[in-house]
Amino acid sequence: MSTKGLKEEIDDVPSVDPVVSETVNSALEQLQLDDPEENATSNAFANKVSQDSQFANGPPSQMFPHPQMMGGMGFMPYSQMMQVPHNPCPFFPPPDFNDPTAPLSSSPLNAGGPPMLFKNDSLPFQMLSSGAAVATQGGQNLNPLINDNSMKVLPIASADPLWTHSNVPGSASVAIEETTATLQESLPSKGRESNNKASSFRRQTFHALSPTDLINAANNVTLSKDFQSDMQNFSKAKKPSVGANNTAKTRTQSISFDNTPSSTSFIPPTNSVSEKLSDFKIETSKEDLINKTAPAKKESPTTYGAAYPYGGPLLQPNPIMPGHPHNISSPIYGIRSPFPNSYEMGAQFQPFSPILNPTSHSLNANSPIPLTQSPIHLAPVLNPSSNSVAFSDMKNDGGKPTTDNDKAGPNVRMDLINPNLGPSMQPFHILPPQQNTPPPPWLYSTPPPFNAMVPPHLLAQNHMPLMNSANNKHHGRNNNSMSSHNDNDNIGNSNYNNKDTGRSNVGKMKNMKNSYHGYYNNNNNNNNNNNNNNNSNATNSNSAEKQRKIEESSRFADAVLDQYIGSIHSLCKDQHGCRFLQKQLDILGSKAADAIFEETKDYTVELMTDSFGNYLIQKLLEEVTTEQRIVLTKISSPHFVEISLNPHGTRALQKLIECIKTDEEAQIVVDSLRPYTVQLSKDLNGNHVIQKCLQRLKPENFQFIFDAISDSCIDIATHRHGCCVLQRCLDHGTTEQCDNLCDKLLALVDKLTLDPFGNYVVQYIITKEAEKNKYDYTHKIVHLLKPRAIELSIHKFGSNVIEKILKTAIVSEPMILEILNNGGETGIQSLLNDSYGNYVLQTALDISHKQNDYLYKRLSEIVAPLLVGPIRNTPHGKRIIGMLHLDS
C-alpha cells in the first residue's frame, strides 16, 4: 500500500492523538513501506510474531507481577520501577511542554509529554510467570488489559534481536522491524467497519527518539536513499542521530537478579533506530515546521522519550519514588516506614529509576546501576534564556557540570540554590555506585514500606518535608525539618541521623496544641537540646566524680598506718582516710589508738563536729585508755553546748557519755551541761544528750536534770522535744525524783491535758503507774478531770486523755458514771455528733460492754434513740449501731 493511503487509514482511527499519528506516519513514510521487499521482510517477521504471540497472552510479566509477589514476597524492588514525573491531571502532562495545545486526556500515549525513559526489564519476574500472563481455569486473564484484544502483544524473547553482537540479554523492548510489521498488521483496512478500526489500534513501543527526530520526520521528510540501501547500511552506519546536538543512545539491559554481572544500562547501539535515520537527509521548510509545531524556541536541552509500552502511562503518581507531585487534596497517609533500612524518601537505601530526577545534570554518578559515561541529559523543557542552575548545567560540554550544585554535592536541594526551580524538582539520595557488579541481594530483601493490601499514599510533594519532620517526632526524635547541622542533607531528611541521646521530652504536649497530633509541627525544641546537653554534662561530671572517688579509695588499699605518722590529722576529715584510720584501730588496737590520740587530741572539738571526723572520735573513745579519755573530756568540756547542738557533735558527745566509767568524767560532764539543761532539753540535737545522761549517768549525777525540769516544768512539758525529756525522766528517775516531778505536773494537769504535747505527759504518767500497779497520781488526775469530762471529750487533745482514762480499768467506771450522771442525754448527744467525742463514746460503749453490763445498758438506752436521721449514714454512726446491735 502507499504511504499516503496508510496515512489516511491512520487518520481514520478513533482516539488517536494527532501528534502521535503524524509521528507514526512520518516514520512509516521514511521506512518506505510500499517497497515489496520491505513488505516481504515485514510480513515474514510478522508471521513469526503471530506464531509466538500465542505464548504471550497479554502484557509482559514484568508489568503485572504474579499476585503472590504482592503478598508474601514483598513489594516490587524499587530499582525495577519506573519514575514518571506526573501532574495532578489524569494523564499528567508536564507543565513545561512545548505544545500547550496537545490533548490532556484523550491521548493515552501522552504524546505531548516530555521525553521519558522506561525500565522494562523482564528478567526479575520470568521465573515466576515464564513470560505468560496469569490466567483463570477458563484461560481468560484476570487483568482487563490482558483481555483486550486490541492490545496485540509482541512475544518476550530470551535475547533482544537488536543486540546480537553485544552479548547482552534481551529486554522486553522489541526491535523496530517487529514494531513496523505488527503495526501494519494492526492497521484497519478499507473494508473494515469503524468499530473494528478502534479495536485494532495498538500502542507501539519505539526506541528512545528525541521529539526533534519525530517532528522533523513528520514534516514532509525526503529521503536521500531508498529503503533497501538503507537496510544494507544499517550495520555500517556510524553517523550521529538526527540533529546536530542530539546523540541517541539506547538502553540494552537493566538490573538482573541472577549472578550474571550486569553490563552497562546505556551503551551506544549497533542497530538502533537513530542509526537507521542517520543516513536520511531531512529537508524541512522552516514555514512548515512553524505551522505544524509549537512556536519556535531556542535550542533546548537534548531529551529522550520512549513510547508507553502496552497500556499507556502510569495512571497514578508513584508515592514511593521521590520527585512525584501528588494531589494536594489527597489523604495524609504518608508516614515514614518503621522498618529499618526500608525503601522510602528518608531511608538509608533509596529507590532508583532510569529516569533520573529532573534536577540531575546527567546520569547520576551515584546511581546504584552501573552506567558508562553518557551524554544523555534529562530535564524538563526550560527556557534556554533562563539562568536556572539546571538549564545552565545541561549546556556544559562533556557531561561535566560546573554549577554550584555540583560543588555542594548531589544531595543539595536545587530550589534552595536557585529559586527558579520549584519544590517538585527535588533531588533524592542515591546509593554509591556498584562498580559494575550486580546489586547485593540484601538490596531487595527489605520489608515493603506499606502492607500489600494498603493503597499507595498520596501526598503533595511540598508536604513531604513536614511529614518527614513529623514522622521523626513520632519515632521519638525531636528533629527539625531543616537543620544547620546537615547542610548537605535532603530536605525532609535533614535530621534523620540526629537521634536524641537524652530522654527529655519537654514541650511535647505544648507543641501538639499548635498542630494536628504533631504531624505538621516544625517548632524547634530548644529545651530538649538544652536538657540533653545538661544531662550529658551531668553524666560526664558524675562519671568523673565516681572515677575520682574510686582512685582515692584505692589509695589506701595497701597502705599502713606507719606511712601516715605525722600527717594523721590530714586523713581525719577525709572519707576514705577516716575509714582507713578506723580500720587501723580495729587491726592494731591500742597501738593505733595511741598514735591517733597523740596527733588528734588537740583537734578533738573540730573532729567531733566534722561529718567524717566524728566517727573517728567515737571509735577512738572506745579504744583509748581511761586517762586518755579523761584528757579528751577535759579538752572538749568547755565546748559541750556547742558540740551538743551540732548534728555531728551530738553523736560524738553521746558516745563520750556512754564511755564514762569514772566519777571524774561524770562530774566533768555534769558541770559542763548543768547551766544549759533547759536549752538542750528543747533542742533537736541537744535533747538527745540530756536523755543520754539520764540513761548512762547515776541518779545522783543526773539530779541536775530533775532540778532544771522542775523549775521549768510547764515550759519543758509543752515543748515538742522537752516532753520527750520529761518522759525519760519518769523512766530513769528514782521514785523520789519521779514523785517530786509528778507533783509539779499534777498542778498543771488542766493545761497539760489541752496541750498538743503536754497531753502525752499526762497519759505517760497514767501508763507508768499502770506498769508499776500504782495508781496514786492516776486517781488524782481522774479526780481533777471528771468535772470537765464532756468538755475534754470533745477537745482534740483532751479527748486523748479521757480515752486513756477509759482504757485504764481501775478508773474507767468512775469516768463512765461521770459521763452518764453529769452529762446525761444532752452530753451524750454532743459526744455522738462531735468528730472527737464520738470516739470517746465508742470507747465507753466498748469498755462497759466488757466490764459492766449495767453501764452498757444505760448508755444503750440513751444512745439508741439518738441514732436517727443523717447520723445513721455516717461512719461513726454505723459503727455505734453495730456495737448496739441495732442493725438487725
UniProtKB/Swiss-Prot annotation:
Question: What InterPro entries does the annotation carry?
Answer: ARM-like, ARM-type_fold, PUM-HD, Pumilio_RNA-bd, Pumilio_RNA-bd_rpt
Q: Which portions of the chain have biased composition (kind: Low complexity)?
A: 478-499, 521-543
**Residue positions of the PTM Phosphoserine?**
256
Q: Name one GO biological process term.
A: nuclear-transcribed mRNA catabolic process, deadenylation-dependent decay
Q: Which residues carry this modification: Phosphothreonine?
A: 205, 212, 252
| Pfam family, any one | PUF
UniProt key word Repeat: yes
Q: A cellular component term (GO) from this record?
A: cytoplasm
Keyword Transcription regulation, does the record have it?
Answer: yes
Report residue spans for region: Disordered. Answer: 236-270, 467-551
Q: What else is known?
A: Present with 721 molecules/cell in log phase SD medium.
What is the protein name given in its UniProt record? Pumilio homology domain family member 4
Q: What organism does the record attribute this protein to? A: Saccharomyces cerevisiae (strain ATCC 204508 / S288c) (Baker's yeast)
Which gene specifies this protein's sequence?
PUF4
